[in-house]
Amino acid sequence: MRLLGLDVGSKTVGVAESDPLGWTAQAVEIIPIDEEAEVFGLERVAELVKSRQVAGFVLGLPKNMNNTEGPRVEAARHYGELLEERFGLPIDYQDERLTTVQAHRMLVEEADVSRRKQKKVIDELAATLILQNYLDCHGKLCAKL
């Protein structure tokens, strides 16, 4: 069984998965969504749940630096509710403050990735960092693995 880590944006959802033992997170893909049109990519998530034997979801929670919650937190929680309704699998949230900044820094400073390529992989890498941080902290869903 695996966990899926999700970095939910307004146009894309970055997806990462844990290994079966819950030690490492790997990038999977980016799912296009359209919040305004209420297109959330749940069909693709369903395919991933089935093919990867998913036991639960970890969603990034984009809190403000002062620990307050803004509209993106509401959007992430709404996406979590949609997942829970559709799949009936447990959901947990991981503070994702600075993960996109960290992902950007990794791509620019460590991998020297072009700006064009960064846009294609930043959400995947952010999802991977969210899930890896969760696994490292032994989040409550880790017991499901």
Swiss-Prot record:
<keyword id="KW-0690">Ribosome biogenesis</keyword>
<dbReference type="InterPro" id="IPR012337">
    <property type="entry name" value="RNaseH-like_sf"/>
</dbReference>
<dbReference type="InterPro" id="IPR005227">
    <property type="entry name" value="YqgF"/>
</dbReference>
<comment type="function">
    <text>Could be a nuclease involved in processing of the 5'-end of pre-16S rRNA.</text>
</comment>
<dbReference type="InterPro" id="IPR037027">
    <property type="entry name" value="YqgF/RNaseH-like_dom_sf"/>
</dbReference>
<comment type="similarity">
    <text>Belongs to the YqgF nuclease family.</text>
</comment>
<dbReference type="GO" id="GO:0005829">
    <property type="term" value="C:cytosol"/>
</dbReference>
<keyword id="KW-0378">Hydrolase</keyword>
<dbReference type="GO" id="GO:0004518">
    <property type="term" value="F:nuclease activity"/>
</dbReference>
<protein>
    <recommendedName>
        <fullName>Putative pre-16S rRNA nuclease</fullName>
        <ecNumber>3.1.-.-</ecNumber>
    </recommendedName>
</protein>
<keyword id="KW-0963">Cytoplasm</keyword>
<dbReference type="GO" id="GO:0000967">
    <property type="term" value="P:rRNA 5'-end processing"/>
</dbReference>
<dbReference type="Pfam" id="PF03652">
    <property type="entry name" value="RuvX"/>
</dbReference>
<dbReference type="InterPro" id="IPR006641">
    <property type="entry name" value="YqgF/RNaseH-like_dom"/>
</dbReference>
<keyword id="KW-0540">Nuclease</keyword>
